[in-house]
Amino acid sequence: MAKIRIHEIAKELGYDSKEIIEKANELGLGIKTASNAVEPEIAAAIYEYIQTREIPEAFKKNIKTPTAKKPKKENIKEQEKLNESEKKEPKKEEKLKQEVKKEELKVEKENVKEEEKQEIIDAHKPQSLASATLAKRRGLVIVKKKKDEEEIQVKKEEVKNSNDISINNEERLSLKTMFSNADESLKKKKKEKKSFVASKKESTEKMNFLDEHDFGDISLDDEDEVVLPDFSVKEQEKPQNINKKQPNFIRQAVGNSAGFGLEGGIQRRSRKKPPKKIEKKEVEEVSSVAISKEIRVYEFADKIGKSTSEVISKLFMLGMMTTKNDFLDEDAIEILAAEFGIEINIINEADEFDYVKDYEEETDEKDLVTRAPVITIMGHVDHGKTSLLDYIRKSRVASGEAGGITQHVGAYMVEKNGRKITFIDTPGHEAFTAMRARGASITDIVIIVVAADDGVKPQTKEAINHAKAAGVPIIIAINKMDKEAANPDMVKTQLAEMEIMPVEWGGSYEFVGVSAKTGMGIEDLLEIVLLQADILELKANPKSFAKASIIESSVQKGRGAVATIIVQNGTLTVGSTVVAGEAYGKVRAMSDDQGKALKEIKPGECGVIVGLSEVADAGEILIAVKTDKEAREYANKRHEYNRQKELSKSTKVSIDELGAKIKEGNLKALPVILKADVQGSLEALKASLEKLRNDEIKVNIIHSGVGGITQSDIELASASENSIVLGFNIRPTGEVKERAKDKGVEIKTYNVIYNLLDDVKALLGGMMSPIISEEQLGQAEIRQVINVPKIGQIAGCMVTEGVINRGAKIRLIRDGVVVYEGNVSSLKRFKDDAKEVAKGYECGVGIEGCDDMRVGDYIESYKEVEEQASL
């Protein structure tokens, strides 16, 4: 089993690590630091010692304490001699014991006789002992003749004088023989039952055992010797010299209702089915307890020793409606702890599989060497970040990206003056915020690229904030200095407003004017980078286990899951066993950014590895471990934790949230299956699509993954109504296309992220309810009202504005207030029907269902126009 560290024991018990180290050293363990690991058995002993304050038996030999060892050894030797002699010559043993214990027996005989008298009196008055015997222990009384008194007293004295409480093997064998003889004698005896009364002249031997043991009817072959139950009340002694483990072959007698001395008094219990021991559970008041961050109500109640209903009622009194399966947040846990008067220690269950925390970096200075600096290039979209890196690498990466914008995180190695520099190129598009944050967190120096003709833009500000949050040095590269519209002073002024002050203005930030097109200032930029790296004194230990960051991951045909990494400490070699989040495996192959095979990747260098069990999440920390088993355990624990966390989301809502939940259920959703070429792009797309929503519509990503579109994706889409499959930088195969056509599933692929987002916006707009607006057609004044039999009222009007159309919607307005809305039922010009009447003409207007028209009212005509909604 895996060893347990001291700090883990301290965290579980809620103690400081120093206290645990002190307690461990009290047990004789040589613990020096909290990171020392011990075996699980030793950890359990430390735990027991701290909880009970009693030194475990296994550690007593390590502690030097004054003990009376000499008398114990003498007693043991004497006992062994007596047992051996008892086997060979029982009669000689009795005489020997009588001589050794002669003086002690005299005193003991008197005590035994007094006890015998008391027992006989108690036997005649069993009803007076009913209440007392419940709290006291019971035993056996062996009634024998006087000839065996000395032998009995010798045995009794041996038990009393012995420091060892447990019964030795020889005594157990003799007792077994005695009880087996008793069984045989019972078979020989007649069926009629007799009651026995102990004589005053008989001596006794009492054997007391724990209450859990049952005693059957016991008698010996000798007719003059009978075993009776001892119902005498004894003063309860302190359980200092009582052995917890008693012989299993002796059971406590369970008599029937007749009682001792009456007909049918004591019965034998079947030996085939021994009675189950009933453990008496004592409810202990919990004063302090360790609680995990994510705990359900019933789990919390179990931890603090309260009933679930009690906890739920307490929460109800605090204004929280919960069920037993609901999760408690930290605030609720602290409030409940205060209510119940319990001290809590909130722990994080994720620490159990935090392999990064368990990773110990070697700090031996003799093994530390200077490593390559890691530089991240950040800035606004289309400001020339990738073009600048292309000039440094003498390559053309930007031209190969769709739309001329970077949509992947790339890691590249460059040599300058015999020294290696690792560059990370991040996207500038607003959708790739997570990628920029990830790049800033694993870098040593950040280069912010700003176009001289464009100035500071939103993503420029965001990149600066990421760099400041990461606490890394910033170098400003003013690009496109070869353009006529270049204005570096404008850039410096804008950045100065953000507290990025140039060195020449008295600040601490280096500004370098460069041109990715002509190469101007590139050498100066690299010199400043190396100078800054020297100031930082970047060092790492290449001899330790490797620790790396995954900046991108994907699935490649024929290779499986691949990951782009930057090693931060140690050296990663081919064949190393690694774990990264839920992914683990053995490194089968490694290559650099140009595809050249590598055998090892040193600290500060980047590369691509193959061999992970699945696509690791971008941003995960990759650690090399000793064995495959250890890696698998870490990954499986993380997977199970994430799965349980996802499945056990709380369903409780407050009254304020209830309306929002109902409204959420009424939202229209666009089901989408999303596939991308790399993990980083998939993450950016998911974040962008989830933002495309309003009070009426949203995007529901039913499945997402890295890799090509498969037939299972088509099957899932066909099972979901009105769903579409979106692919980014991937193309479906012929079989998948045919399958999609048969199932009626639409597949859309893109290679530019904003094209995908624009199309999804258009789809969402089509699903939204159209925007209805009114268009005013005209207005007419009622100058006469005519009542026509069987038809109703007809208004004689003069059109004052626009036109009045037959069938148009109208409003009847009186004193500026709308009194009726309806449609034009009839429209006539003199006696002829008309489709419309223009301004300045008289007409007769009939309004459907309206019989309350008056002279001086106005009729307003309008029509409703529907417009397509957009997100």
Curated annotation (Swiss-Prot):
Protein origin, superkingdom: Bacteria
Subcellular location as annotated: Cytoplasm
Region described as G1: spans on this chain: 379-386
UniProt feature, compositional bias: Basic and acidic residues: 73-101
UniProt xrefs under SUPFAM superfamilies: Initiation factor IF2/eIF5b, domain 3 (SSF52156), P-loop containing nucleoside triphosphate hydrolases (SSF52540), Translation proteins (SSF50447)
Domain tr-type G: 370-537
Positions of region (G4): 479-482
PANTHER family referenced in this protein's UniProt entry, alphabetically: TR-TYPE G DOMAIN-CONTAINING PROTEIN, TRANSLATION INITIATION FACTOR IF-2-RELATED
NCBIfam families, sorted: IF-2, small_GTP
Record-given protein name: Translation initiation factor IF-2
Gene: infB
